């Protein structure tokens, strides 16, 4: 059932819509794909902004004004960027965020009910980023939204945004890709593979059939997968600053995972305590099968698939593009964003590659709104000519290929 809440400066619509029969890229067909979304602000026919969430995110991108003291997924994942008076201002824009197929926050996925009344489990069709984009397009059709003023995405949500420029190039005026890339590199592919094996090696995973109150969930495997993710999202400098080699009180969480008998002789360190805490909290809110499905979709995405190059894939896009990367992000590097910027430039797409100096790793796009907000706000409002938007090729040309890539760093304050 649709829920609409209106408070001063906030109009929020939250719903799950049955968009009907949906054929996945795999060829499998779901007779009734359900899609969960939240929408903020008022639609005037030209001001729609689609925000694409990250790997384990949800449609809950912005706050409802009643979130004091809440944590986890109950708290908006980008509430410092999206909302009334924020960088993506819901007083000006109609902002939609859609939970992607394969996830577990209301959209159909492995944990949702199948035709037999039981959870799908691993019988749910494989999903791809292309499936996400097409489901979003159908949901927007249901809402009466045609051309989008902007599509904005961070991390794998940035891949989702890029896919919009390929599948529906005429439907997007401005494209903002934050902390993302045209594809994963082999190191990230390897880490994702180990994370999935942590889940499938948990005896409680049981081939993906673990649903029901009487059955234990593969929380240990899912927790280990999440711990790998957190190591991936932080930078070496930020981890050293946050934890160092300091010891922590073992407490209850020190026994969250089996350990060898000698472990009691050695210190239980703060970094271990942090990872155990994150594992515990993640297992409370996420589904292990969904993690398998969504990491597969991310691993599979390749912008140039079916084309000769990234530039060829983007050739039909005639809007403007902003790429935001972070110097401390080794998950999606500034070099990967610069390569992507080159693909846009070769297609004569107005593009800016805005590099932010940060040592917060991949998480910078979530934890440094004071640096992310200004370029996003100005780009959504004004395009690449926005005052706070910088570029690695300030003259609008291509960086000198004979020289090492040297990004133009930015330290930004409020608008």
UniProtKB/Swiss-Prot annotation:
GO BP term, pick one: methionine biosynthetic process
One cellular component term from this protein's GO annotations in UniProt: cytoplasm
Enzyme class: transferase
Keywords from the UniProt entry: Acyltransferase, Amino-acid biosynthesis, Cytoplasm, Methionine biosynthesis, Transferase
Superkingdom of origin organism: Archaea
Any one GO molecular function term: homoserine O-acetyltransferase activity
EC number(s) per entry: 2.3.1.31
Pfam families named among the record's database cross-references: Abhydrolase_1
Catalytic activity: L-homoserine + acetyl-CoA = O-acetyl-L-homoserine + CoA
Region (Disordered): 383-415
Main localization of the protein described in the UniProt heading: cytoplasm
Record pathway: Amino-acid biosynthesis; L-methionine biosynthesis via de novo pathway; O-acetyl-L-homoserine from L-homoserine: step 1/1
Places the protein is found: Cytoplasm
NCBIfam families reported in the protein's UniProt record: homoserO_Ac_trn (TIGR01392), PRK00175.1 (NF001209)
Record's function text: Transfers an acetyl group from acetyl-CoA to L-homoserine, forming acetyl-L-homoserine.
Record's protein name: Homoserine O-acetyltransferase
């Amino acid at each position: 059932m649709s829920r609409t809440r209106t408070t001063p400066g906030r109009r929020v619509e939250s719903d799950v819509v049955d968009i009907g029969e949906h054929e996945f890229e795999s060829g499998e067909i779901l007779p009734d794909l359900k899609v969960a979304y939240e929408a903020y602000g008022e639609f005037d026919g030209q001001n729609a902004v689609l925000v694409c969430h990250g790997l384990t995110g949800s449609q809950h991108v912005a706050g409802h004004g009643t979130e004091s003291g809440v944590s986890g997924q109950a708290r908006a994942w980008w509430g410092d960027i999206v909302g009334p008076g924020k960088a993506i201002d819901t007083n000006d824009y109609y902002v939609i965020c859609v939970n992607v197929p394969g996830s577990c926050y209301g959209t159909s996925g492995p944990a949702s009910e199948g035709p037999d009344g039981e959870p799908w489990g691993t019988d749910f069709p494989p999903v791809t980023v292309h499936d996400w984009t097409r489901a979003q397009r159908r949901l927007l059709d249901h809402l009466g939204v045609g051309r989008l003023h902007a599509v904005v995405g961070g991390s794998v949500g940035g891949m989702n945004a890029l896919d919009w420029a390929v599948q529906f190039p005429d439907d997007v005026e401005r494209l903002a890709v934050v902390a993302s890339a045209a594809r994963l590199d082999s190191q990230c592919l390897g880490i994702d593979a180990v994370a999935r094996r942590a889940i499938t090696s948990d005896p409680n995973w049981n081939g993906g059939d673990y649903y029901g109150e009487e059955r234990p969930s593969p929380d240990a495997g899912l927790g280990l997968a999440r711990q790998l993710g957190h190591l991936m999202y932080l930078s070496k400098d930020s981890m050293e600053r946050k934890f160092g080699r300091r010891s922590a009180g073992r407490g209850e969480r020190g026994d969250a995972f089996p350990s060898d008998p000698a472990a009691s002789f050695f210190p239980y360190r703060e970094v271990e305590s942090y990872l155990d805490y994150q594992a515990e909290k993640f297992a409370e809110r996420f589904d292990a099968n969904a993690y398998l499905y969504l990491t597969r979709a991310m691993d599979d995405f390749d912008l140039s698939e079916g084309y000769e190059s990234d530039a060829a894939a983007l050739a039909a896009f005639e809007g403007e593009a902003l790429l935001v990367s972070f110097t401390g992000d080794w998950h999606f590097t500034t070099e990967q964003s610069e390569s992507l910027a080159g693909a846009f430039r070769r297609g004569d797409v107005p593009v800016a590659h805005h590099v932010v100096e940060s040592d917060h790793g991949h998480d910078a796009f979530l934890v440094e709104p004071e640096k992310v907000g200004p370029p996003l706000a100005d780009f959504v409002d004004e395009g690449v000519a926005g005052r706070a938007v910088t570029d690695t090729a300030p003259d609008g040309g291509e960086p000198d290929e004979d020289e090492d890539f040297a990004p133009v760093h930015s330290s930004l304050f409020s608008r």
